[in-house]
Regions:
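Short aromatic/hydrophobic helix-turn
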Residues: 95-104, 146-155, 200-201
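Membrane-interface segments at the starts/ends of alpha-helical transmembrane spans
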Residues: 4-16, 105
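Membrane-interfacial segments
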Residues: 37-44, 72-80, 135, 139, ...
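Membrane-interface micro-motifs in multi-pass membrane enzymes
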Residues: 2, 22-26, 109-122, 164-181, ...
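Alpha-helical transmembrane segments and terminal signal-anchor/GPI-anchor hydrophobic tails
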Residues: 150-248, 252-277
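Transmembrane alpha-helical segments and their boundary/interface "anchor" motifs
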Residues: 11, 18-27, 38-79, 83-100, ...
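Hydrophobic transmembrane alpha-helices
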Residues: 30, 34-38, 105, 124-133, ...
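Hydrophobic alpha-helical transmembrane segments of integral membrane proteins
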Residues: 55-74, 144-165
Length: 295
């Protein structure tokens, strides 16, 4: 809102870019639901094996960075961990993050910023393994309708803190997750007419609090619109490269952002944003390279 009122086109564009970035979570959640359904709907693995396997995959990314954060905290020269947190708070935050329970602290963001995504994703893995793996399509559609109704009612009552709490956890993301499962089971071809309508509704959802509730699913339509371009080189190679870096980016980019923001007053917003983007990719690439060496 402040960006729009400023009338500065540059600030408006940068603010929109920053705001729209969080819709990447919608894409990841959709792909998670789609991939889990393809992988496990008809497999013989037990539900507990699925949950443990997914937890281990997340720990592979989280534990090394956790160790680095602890070393940084006790090095005497803090670089990455937030300075306002005492040593005891660091340990409790680490415990919450590694047990995927940090999302219960909806009143504050813990030190690793987007690490909330891993907790939310793990919740979805558990829900899928225990309840959705063998569920009918009617159950999935019922969940979608139920969550949408809940969020719309809460939003209409002005209970935005509750909406935030649900969006900070798996409940708020269940609709787009269930859509991923449904499309995995029943592939569909969507015409350009419906894609165009979806794109228009997505744009409208940016300005309407009720449409915003379903915006995680509406965000799939702009992706579908540009998907033909993504299948062409060199863009396809770039997207595949970024896809491989996605987990590492989630783990590392909050700490890169902290360092860039500490010095961004001396730089124009465009340069600061470009520097942030390049550093995020480089740090994530190095982090992934180190992990692939050990794993």
């Amino acid at each position: 809102t402040e960006a729009m009122l400023s009338g500065n086109l540059r600030i408006i564009i940068l603010s929109l870019f920053s705001f729209l970035g969080h819709y990447g979570v919608s894409i990841f959640v959709f792909v998670s639901g789609y991939g889990l359904s393809k992988r496990y709907d008809h497999s013989g693995e037990s539900k507990w094996y699925i949950i443990l396997r997914r937890a281990i995959q997340l720990w592979k990314w989280l534990v090394p960075m956790t160790l680095l954060l602890i070393l940084d905290r006790y090095s005497g020269h803090t670089h990455f961990t937030y300075a306002y947190l005492g040593n005891n708070k660091i340990w409790t935050d680490m415990l919450f993050m590694l047990t995927f329970t940090a999302n219960g602290l909806a009143d504050r963001f813990i030190i690793a910023g987007p690490w909330w995504y891993f907790g939310m994703a793990f919740q979805l893995y558990v829900i899928y393994a225990l309840f959705l793996r063998k569920s009918s399509d009617k159950v999935l559609w019922g969940i979608i309708a139920g969550v949408w109704t809940l969020l719309i009612v809460l939003s209409s009552l002005g209970l935005d803190n509750w909406v935030f709490a649900f969006r900070y956890n798996s409940i708020g993301w269940l609709p787009v997750f269930c859509v991923g499962i449904l499309l995995s089971r029943h592939p569909v071809h969507i015409s350009w007419r419906w894609i165009s309508l979806g794109v228009v509704l997505f744009v409208l959802s940016l300005f309407n609090r009720y449409l915003w509730v379903i915006s995680p699913i509406l965000a799939l339509f702009p992706v579908a619109a540009v998907l033909p371009l993504a299948r062409k080189e060199p863009l396809q190679n770039v997207l595949l490269f970024m896809g491989k870096l996605s987990a590492a980016l989630f783990v590392t980019h909050a700490f890169v952002r902290q360092q860039v923001l500490a010095h961004d007053q001396a730089l124009p917003p465009e340069i600061s944003g470009l520097l942030y983007l390049v550093l995020c990719i480089v740090v994530a690439w190095v982090y992934r390279l180190c992990l692939t060496y050990f794993y």
